Every structure is written in C-alpha cells, then in structure tokens.
Swiss-Prot record:
Keywords: ATP-binding, Cytoplasm, Ligase, Nucleotide-binding. This is RNA 3'-terminal phosphate cyclase. GO terms for molecular function: ATP binding; RNA-3'-phosphate cyclase activity. Its main location: cytoplasm. InterPro entries: RNA3'-term_phos_cycl_insert (IPR013791), RNA3'_phos_cyclase_dom (IPR023797), RNA3'_phos_cyclase_dom_sf (IPR037136), RNA3'_term_phos_cyc (IPR000228), RNA3'_term_phos_cyc_type_1 (IPR017770), RNA3'P_cycl/enolpyr_Trfase_a/b (IPR013792), RPTC_insert (IPR036553). It catalyses: a 3'-end 3'-phospho-ribonucleotide-RNA + ATP = a 3'-end 2',3'-cyclophospho-ribonucleotide-RNA + AMP + diphosphate. Gene3D superfamilies: RNA 3'-terminal phosphate cyclase domain (3.65.10.20), RNA 3'-terminal phosphate cyclase, insert domain (3.30.360.20). Signal peptide: none annotated.
Amino acid sequence: MLDIDGSWGEGGGQILRTTLSLSAITGQPIRLYQIRAGRQKPGLSAQHLTCVRAAATICNAEVRGDKLRSTLLEFIPTRPPQAGHYTFDVMDAQEGGSAGAVTLILQTILLPLAIASEESTVILKGGTHVAWSPPISYIEQVYLPLLSKLGLQTELHLQAWGWYPQGGGEVHLHIKGNCQLQGVELLERGALKQVKGLAVVTELPSHIPQRMAMRCEKLLQQAHVKGYVQPLRAKGVAPGAGVFLTSEYEHICAGFAALGRRGLPAESVAQNAVEQLLSFHQQDAPVEEFLGDQLLLPMILAQSPSQYRVAHISEHLKTNVQTISQFGLAQIDLNLEDRLVFVKPGHNLT
C-alpha cells in the first residue's frame, strides 16, 4: 500500500483527487493521511467525500475512512475502471453543509473512465459555479477542448446552474472510452482572436447580467481587446450571479471567472473577471496558472512526452508534481526561471 501525506505542499483537496484518480487507473492501493490537515476545517468535506465515493464506484474499491471530516483514508481498487451510467450527487454527502463543486468530482473520475473499454455517461449534481474551484463554464470552454487535443473525447451539457451554498446544479457528461492520449507542446499561444463570455444570473433581475456584460465590454474596449459578452437570465434553485470569460488565442484558450455575492455591485463582478483576463493577456505564456496543474494528470498518461509554458508555477503545480511522482508513472521537470514544465511518461523513460 502506498502511503501519501495529505498535508504536503499546499495541502489541499487536489492531493486527494490526484491520488484517487491514479489509484483507480493503476490499481495501486493507497493510504492517505493528514488529509487537508492545514485547512480551517481539516479532513473530507462533502465534495471530497463525493470524490472518494465516485472513484470507489467506478473501480469497486474497498474504502475505509470515507466519512465527513475524516483525515485518514484507505482506498483499495478491486478492478479496473468500469464504463457505465453513473450519477453522483454532492448533496448525498453534505449533511447540512454547503453544496460542493461538481467540477472537482468530474476531474477525479474523467481520466479513469476515459481509459475504460466503453463509453460512459455521468450525471453530476451539486454546485456548478462555486468559489475556489473551476466553474463548469471553464471546464466546457477551456479544459475539455484542450484535452481533446490530447485525444480525449467528451460531450458536456449544463442542465441547471448551481451556486454556493445551495447547489442544485446538474451537469451531464459523456465520455468516449478506450482513450489513447498523445503528448502536446504548448509553448506559444499565438495571436488573440477574440474574447467571448457570459454574464449570467439566476433568480435575479435581468438588468444585472446586462450591467455586467456592458461593463465587461467597455473595459475590454478600453484595453483595445475585441470581445462580446452575452447577458443571460436563467432559472435556478437560488439567486446567483457570475461572469465567465474565455480568451481564444490561435493555439489555446484561457478562462477567467468572477462570482457575485450579496452587496457586490454587478460592475465590480465584471471588473474582477476582466482584470484577470487582461493580466494574463499582458504576459506571453500560453497556459494560465490554474490550468498549469490540471494538465499534469492527462499528460503523464499520454503515449508521448509533453511540454508547456505556464504563466506562474504555483504551489498547486509543485504539489501535484510531488503527488504524481510517488506513483512512479512519469518524470516531471520544472524550469522555474522560464516557467516550463516537461512531462515524460513512464514508458518513455530511459
């Protein structure tokens, strides 16, 4: 059994998600201890517990420690990941807490199901647009399109918006199995073709998304960036608001999000999102910071090496390198000065 310290590095839930994915894929039993030990509320939250149960379901794992606030987990797969029709609901684990992010569950089970022998359909219920996690709009516009370049084929449909803390969102994901991933090189992003976005609210007046969209477009215009932001008023189980922007470059896309909250003007939400976008645009890296650590897992499973240049080598990225290295599946090297990441899958090691 492989022992992994969940408090290492930035010590967050990413260690858990990466470990679960690789355990399911390789069949390697793991013992994860000190889970999220440095957090204000250590241990497994509802979204982390749902990740555990989802990963266990697809590989029929024997699990010990799968309860809220647990800081110790044993996870023993008994079969390779199995394709199928699955439904995972964060509310099943929340016990009065907030609705966690379905995108984190998606990223936990995506690659195990992609290498399964058949197609899979997954329904995820909970928070679709939640702070401190990638919103489903980012997954749809940035993450999955890039993985398609590696050879992973998916279809994603947002059925209902779900905000923190009520949740109530729903996502349908179709994953084509038997995936053979190929490495990629992401060193140049090319020219900016356009910026597109969505300013959305649920259960709030229609003037709010209109104000957010207008403010976004005005700020982009002032920066001499062409962009169109669509205002949208949708139905949901609770009020919520957000701006989701995508910068489309010649070779890659980058995504940026800002969520509304009570008392925060619509224009401030828009400005937050645009400032993130312009800050990245002023750099020359093709891969933005948050995508940087999310690319490692698919790249170590590819048939050929990958390399990419990232806007910032974050603690999340360094922590993910450390977590992955314990499975011995790849050689990952970081060039801190040039912000380069080199990934050499295990079957390419000499």
